[in-house]
């Protein structure tokens, strides 16, 4: 009796059999029945899927299919430079959805295989932004997965099938629509084989992941767990056909240009035997990456089967100073425009001098993180200002100069003239 008073009873989920210590929550029903939170989510997903089958479907394919020129023009609004990569992606995406439209209309006399895309380029060159912009333009489900988190099935890490769950979630659970979406796999270069020669230690996050990805890249029905994380035998998997999913893989592939240079005949020359000096390194890298071929990827550590499933390769070039300056101000989502809008919500006008922009670009280039470094630099410069502005209601303008960027001086804050001041008095200036 004493033991039962101090030891609470153990309750089990009537569906999966786990007790209250193994789940987040147990819900009590009539007749001593219990159901855990995970089984509730699973049953809700099953019911919602059945209801979707009975309800009218949203259009699976994009309602309109822009031509390659229109796709490239749209990309130009958001991504600076990378003209060759834009053209390659515009053609590949147009052909992919044109193929799906033909299939939907019953035109199947010739079987056209899909062309997945491999983006090769340094960090911050626009790989992810290109894929995101394409998906947003076409209004198709889009998801991003990180290849570094993937491991071969049976090992600690994320199974390759679970990345498809993100695409289902992006389609609001509509599996049919998700099967026509775009999945971007970032950091794909990190799953390269660790060495040219097979090791006695199993490479579960390198070649093992490449092997596991082959089926979903090629196209076929894959069983996707309805919830990420721990699996249990009672869960019902979601059949997912990847045949019509467009896979875009991207990676920095650091060091790849060295092998391309060796293949071209000399590590120090390119083209007409011209010696490449230090100041020409950026242009050299641009030219070399544009010459990447399957042999280079094989040497980098990718198995032939994986390379064969990524037939479209687009090289993105490193961003130079001029491109970085344009990224700051020209695109629709330009970084300076974003922060000007952010401060405008606090009724403050942000001004950035031309010299300050050059200094921001120099700081980003020194960090070697591409366009991402621009946002980091601006965020650091404006951190204190954005912290204080909501408390200082008399500030009307914030000015960033080159000294602010290079020397760490505080941005100049222009304050509103006090209502008690004489008419016509100029606003006071305060460096804070």
Swiss-Prot record:
Could you tell me what this protein does?
ATP-dependent specificity component of the Clp protease. It directs the protease to specific substrates. Can perform chaperone functions in the absence of ClpP.
Q: Which family does it belong to?
A: Belongs to the ClpX chaperone family.
Gene3D superfamilies listed in its UniProt record: 1.10.8.60, ClpX chaperone, C4-type zinc finger domain, P-loop containing nucleotide triphosphate hydrolases
Positions contributing to ATP binding: 122-129
Q: How does it assemble?
A: Component of the ClpX-ClpP complex. Forms a hexameric ring that, in the presence of ATP, binds to fourteen ClpP subunits assembled into a disk-like structure with a central cavity, resembling the structure of eukaryotic proteasomes.
**Keywords in alphabetical order:** ATP-binding, Chaperone, Metal-binding, Nucleotide-binding, Zinc
Domain (ClpX-type ZB): give its ranges.
1-55
Q: Which GO terms describe its biological process?
A: cell division; proteolysis involved in protein catabolic process
HAMAP family in the cross-refs: ClpX
List, alphabetically, the GO terms of the cellular component aspect.
HslUV protease complex
What gene is behind this protein?
clpX
Q: By what name is this protein known?
A: ATP-dependent Clp protease ATP-binding subunit ClpX
Decide whether keyword 4Fe-4S is in the record: no
**Provenance organism:** Herpetosiphon aurantiacus (strain ATCC 23779 / DSM 785 / 114-95)
InterPro entries found in the cross-reference section:
AAA+_ATPase, ATP-dep_Clp_protease_ClpX, ATPase_AAA_core, Clp_ATPase_C, Clp_protease_ATP-bd_su_ClpX, ClpX_bact, P-loop_NTPase, Znf_CppX_C4
Q: What GO MF annotations does this protein's record show?
A: ATP binding; ATP hydrolysis activity; ATP-dependent protein folding chaperone; protein dimerization activity; unfolded protein binding; zinc ion binding
Annotated residues that bind Zn(2+) are located at 13, 16, 36, 39
Domain of life of the native organism: Bacteria
**Where do the segments described as Disordered lie?**
412-432
């Amino acid at each position: 009796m004493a033991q039962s008073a101090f030891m609470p009873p153990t309750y089990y989920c009537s569906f999966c059999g786990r007790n209250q210590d193994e789940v987040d929550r147990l819900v009590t029903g009539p007749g001593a029945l219990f159901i855990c939170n995970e089984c509730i989510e699973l049953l809700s997903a099953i019911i919602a899927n059945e209801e979707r089958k009975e309800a009218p479907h949203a259009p699976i394919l994009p309602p309109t299919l822009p031509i390659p020129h229109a796709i490239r023009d749209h990309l130009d609004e958001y991504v600076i430079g990378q003209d060759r990569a834009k053209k390659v992606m515009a053609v590949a995406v147009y052909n992919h959805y044109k193929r799906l439209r033909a299939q939907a209309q019953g035109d199947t006399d010739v079987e056209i295989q899909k062309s997945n895309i491999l983006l090769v380029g340094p960090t911050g060159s626009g790989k992810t932004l290109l894929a995101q912009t394409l998906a947003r333009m076409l209004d198709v489900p889009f998801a991003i997965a990180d290849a570094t988190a993937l491991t071969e099935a049976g090992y600690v890490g994320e199974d390759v099938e679970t990345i498809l769950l993100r695409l289902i979630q992006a389609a609001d659970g509509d599996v049919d629509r998700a099967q026509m979406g775009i999945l971007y796999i970032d950091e794909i270069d990190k799953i390269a084989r660790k060495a040219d020669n097979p090791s006695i230690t199993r490479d579960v996050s390198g070649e093992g992941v490449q092997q596991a990805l082959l089926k979903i890249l090629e196209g076929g029905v894959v069983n996707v767990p309805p919830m990420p994380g721990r699996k249990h035998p009672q869960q019902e998997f979601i059949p997912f056909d990847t045949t019509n999913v467009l896979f875009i893989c991207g990676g920095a592939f650091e060091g790849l240009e060295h092998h391309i240079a060796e293949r071209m005949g000399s590590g120090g020359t390119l083209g007409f035997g011209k010696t490449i000096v230090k100041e020409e390194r950026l242009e050299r890298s641009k030219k070399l990456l544009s010459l990447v071929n399957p042999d280079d990827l094989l040497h980098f550590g990718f198995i032939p089967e994986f390379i064969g499933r990524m037939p479209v390769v687009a090289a993105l070039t490193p961003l130079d100073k001029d491109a970085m300056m344009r990224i700051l101000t020209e695109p629709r989502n330009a970084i300076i425009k974003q922060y000007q809008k952010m401060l405008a919500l606090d009724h403050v006008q942000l001004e950035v001098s031309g010299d300050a922009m050059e200094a921001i670009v120099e700081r980003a280039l020194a960090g070697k993180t591409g366009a991402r470094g621009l946002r980091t630099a601006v965020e650091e410069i404006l951190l204190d200002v954005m912290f204080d502005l909501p408390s200082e209601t008399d500030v009307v303008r914030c000015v960033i100069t080159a000294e602010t960027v290079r020397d760490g001086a505080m941005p100049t804050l222009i304050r509103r003239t006090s209502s008690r001041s004489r008419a016509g008095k100029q606003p006071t200036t305060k460096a804070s």
